[in-house]
Amino acid sequence: MADTNPNAPPRSDSLLNPADALKYLEEYPRGDGLSLQELMDSRKNGGLTYNDFLVLPGHISFPASDVSLQSRATKNIVLNTPFLSSPMDTVTEDRMAIALALHGGLGIIHHNCSAEEQAAMVRRVKKYENGFITDPLCLGPDATVGDVLEIKAKFGFCGVPITETGAPNSKLLGIVTGRDVQFQDAETPIKSVMTTEVVTGSSPITLEKANSLLRETKKGKLPIVDSNGHLVSLVARSDLLKNQNYPYASKVPESKQLYCGAAIGTRPGDKDRLKLLAEAGLDVVVLDSSQGDSVYQIEFIKWIKQTYPKIEIIAGNVVTREQAAQLIAAGADGLRIGMGSGSICITQEVMAVGRPQGTAVYAVAEFASRFGIPCIADGGIGNIGHIAKALALGASAVMMGGLLAGTTESPGEYFYHEGKRVKVYRGMGSIEAMEHTQRGSASGKRSILNLDNAATARYFSEADAVKVAQGVSGDVADKGSINKFVPYLFTGLQHSFQDAGVKSVSELHSCARSGSLRFELRTASAQLEGGVHGLNSYTKRLFA
């Protein structure tokens, strides 16, 4: 009589040998899930966003700490962390740019301010950390304590070399420090309080040797002089501490200064703006437009390449291969992808133009990769999972606005709304941003019409009598400091890569292209299942 017990174990003669499981796996014609190409077939699946799919897990054979997140923001700029901050006036000024660069990313300073203000912010970023400071701020012997205090108020330090002419490349007479000017009257001459017995390094000298000498002498600053006693450069102890505390900091290899980016428009006046930014030491310029495929941007790229060949150009925004091709052909060093996907953006709703971000990132990044052009996924990044998915789709880095808004380093003051500590966060297409009239020195009718406003320039609406909003203004909760938030993103992304079975961004891209990295579409109920559910109440702590 046949065994009808449903709980009985299967007969051993019907089972395969467990030791051969991997061999039998090869008999399946295809792996679980979908390849990237199958997933992103928009003719079959439509336009997809980050929440519409998942990356399937891979094989783990390494600790998460072994994962490298090094990637390119442009053809020639390598970041240790694939994070950029958005050039929005409630997200990125010099504090954000410094903090993000120290953690391996890149801050893009907004341009909804005067050119002089923007250049000053770039200069503060570039002066924050150095290897050899080849153009140190100097004072002459006739300067006063008040001059030193002014430097401290403006740049945050007061260790200043004193030279015969008050400039580098002249004879070093001494150095003045914070202790020298304490309790001194502002009118006191520097020559009466400066230290004249100065420990120096002799040029030529390696940075390693200079840093070693700085540690041995326990001084705050080490002037480097030539055989004639002329000041050649300066090395600072504060930079040694920054190197120790921020090992992933993104720096220019030659100067050891932090990388800094800034946004500009594509109007004639922006040529003068870029001149000031270049003089301040700008590394990369972002051409800021909601729709980058314009004759204005194409001509501007060509002009920048001729005038400032050492400045990298991130062009955009684009969401199609056709748009990307125009900017790549013009000479762009990187592309910014996204149109209407940001949390404060309503372009798709109002203009009926744009593209779901997942599909846009895949289409543009796949095309641009053939030319070696890195792509930045801009918009729709709400959590670590979105970052991982954007990179899996082919992006080399992500640009974040709302995710970084509300941090200590973002512009603006905290206030309380309905009992929560918040900061203002607004889209550059919002009416509030378009009505901001402090970008340039414009006044009168020009200021009233917002003819020199970054937000209106971004959306090609400077001369419009009626402003049509493509963004909103609101507030976001206090997220604390970048110094805790970015390490949380970094570590979480390392664990995401570990779960996928890849050890680097380049390996992630390679596996996605080859089909070994697999994906799965998510239904609405699958998305619901993947979030917190079934609880009466809960507390969502992101990191500790």
Swiss-Prot record:
This is Inosine-5'-monophosphate dehydrogenase. Residues 132-192, 194-250 form the CBS domain. Keywords: CBS domain, Cytoplasm, GMP biosynthesis, Metal-binding, NAD, Oxidoreductase, Potassium, Purine biosynthesis, Repeat. It holds the Pfam family IMPDH. IMP binds at residues 343, 378-380, 401-402, 425-429, 470. Its EC number is 1.1.1.205. InterPro entries: Aldolase_TIM, CBS_dom, CBS_dom_sf, IMP_DH, IMP_DH/GMP_Rdtase_CS, IMP_DH_GMPRt. Catalyzes the conversion of inosine 5'-phosphate (IMP) to xanthosine 5'-phosphate (XMP), the first committed and rate-limiting step in the de novo synthesis of guanine nucleotides, and therefore plays an important role in the regulation of cell growth. K(+) binds at residues 340, 342, 345, 529-531. It comes from Cryptococcus neoformans var. neoformans serotype D (strain JEC21 / ATCC MYA-565). One of its GO terms (cellular component) is cytoplasm. It is found in: Cytoplasm. Mycophenolic acid (MPA) is a non-competitive inhibitor that prevents formation of the closed enzyme conformation by binding to the same site as the amobile flap. In contrast, mizoribine monophosphate (MZP) is a competitive inhibitor that induces the closed conformation. MPA is a potent inhibitor of mammalian IMPDHs but a poor inhibitor of the bacterial enzymes. MZP is a more potent inhibitor of bacterial IMPDH. The active site is at residues 345, 458. Belongs to the IMPDH/GMPR family. One of its GO terms (molecular function) is nucleotide binding. Homotetramer. NAD(+) binds at residues 288-290, 338-340. It catalyses: IMP + NAD(+) + H2O = XMP + NADH + H(+). PANTHER family: INOSINE-5'-MONOPHOSPHATE DEHYDROGENASE (PTHR11911:SF111), INOSINE-5-MONOPHOSPHATE DEHYDROGENASE RELATED (PTHR11911). Its cofactor is K(+).
